[in-house]
Regions:
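Helix-turn-helix
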Residues: 1-33
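C-terminal peripheral helix-coil segments that are non-catalytic and often amphipathic
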Residues: 130-159
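Hydrophobic alpha-helical connector segments
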Residues: 47-81, 88, 117
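Amphipathic alpha-helical segments used for helix-helix packing
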Residues: 39, 67-97, 126-130
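DNA major-groove recognition helix of helix-turn-helix
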Residues: 28, 38-39, 114
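Short, solvent-exposed positions on alpha-helices
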Residues: 37, 57, 78, 107-112
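Amphipathic alpha-helical packing segments from all-alpha helical-bundle domains
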Residues: 62, 81-116, 122, 136-144
Length: 159
């Protein structure tokens, strides 16, 4: 996935692992089950907020690590958006809630904040993946928009 930017076939995966394709089906009922397991495993690599930093910094680290993951695995975003399961999204959502716990925001505020942020990050990741050689579009370019988002979130949560 990292080198080709697309989801490989079960046969290609088996060949890379030097195993029979049927061995993969022994552990995964179908390609979608394998994709979900791989995708969740990859998403679990993103920053895990532990509450050691201010919530603003925890959120920034989470977002930038997520974008880096999506940049490093060009086909991952498309795979995740096509999935019917919530596995990968649940990982990000849980970490988002941990990062924002000190904010004491209302549940509706957190849901709206998460929905908005996810859409923004996915749009930014898509732009990076469509222009991989564009040096003017890198993960650090989210600093300004994230700072604005964080200030707005702080104001909204204090209402």
């Amino acid at each position: 996935m990292r080198t080709e930017g697309k989801v490989p076939s079960i046969r290609k995966i088996a060949g890379t692992l030097n195993v029979d394709a049927m061995a993969i089906y022994h552990y995964f009922s179908n390609k979608n089950a394998l994709l979900e397991a791989v995708t969740v495993s990859l998403v679990e690599e993103i920053y895990k907020p532990l509450g050691e930093n201010p919530w603003q910094e925890e959120l920034k680290l989470l977002c930038k690590s997520y974008l880096k993951l999506l940049k490093d695995h060009a086909g991952l975003l498309k795979t995740m958006l096509a999935m019917t399961s919530e596995g990968p999204a649940a990982v990000f959502t849980q970490r988002f809630h941990v990062a924002l716990a000190p904010l004491n925001a209302k549940e509706t505020q957190l849901k709206n904040a998460l929905d908005f942020l996810a859409d923004y990050l996915h749009g930014f990741a898509l732009a990076m993946n469509c222009n991989p050689k564009d040096e003017h579009l890198c993960v650090d370019f989210v600093d300004g928009p994230l700072a604005f988002y964080i200030r707005t979130l702080s104001l909204e949560a204090s209402r």
